[in-house]
C-alpha cells in the first residue's frame, strides 16, 4: 500500500471513530464524551511522534479538531458553566 493511500485510510478511520463517539453522546454523560475526546487527542499526539511525516497532522489541525469538539459540546449542552469546564479540560 503506498504512502498516500495509507494516510487516507488513517484519516478516514479517525473520522469514523470520532463521528461514532459523537453520535453516541445521548447515551453518555458530557464527562464521558470529554474523556473519550481526550483519548483521541492523546492518540493523535502520540502518532505525531512515532509515524513518518505522511501520517502526521499538524498542530493547527489538532487545534481545529479541539475547537470543533468544543463547539459540538456547546451545542449539545445548555449548561454554560459545564460547557466552559469541558472546554478548559479539553484544551491544553
From Swiss-Prot:
GO cellular component, one term: host cell mitochondrion
InterPro entries: Rotavirus_NSP6 (IPR006950)
Superkingdom as given in the UniProt entry: Viruses
Transmembrane segments: none
Subcellular location: Host cytoplasm; Host mitochondrion
Keyword terms, alphabetized: Host cytoplasm, Host mitochondrion
The protein's assembly and partners: Interacts with NSP2 and NSP5.
Family: Belongs to the rotavirus A NSP6 family.
Protein name per its UniProtKB record: Non-structural protein 6
Organism of derivation: Rotavirus A (strain RVA/Human/Japan/KU/1995/G1P1A[8]) (RV-A)
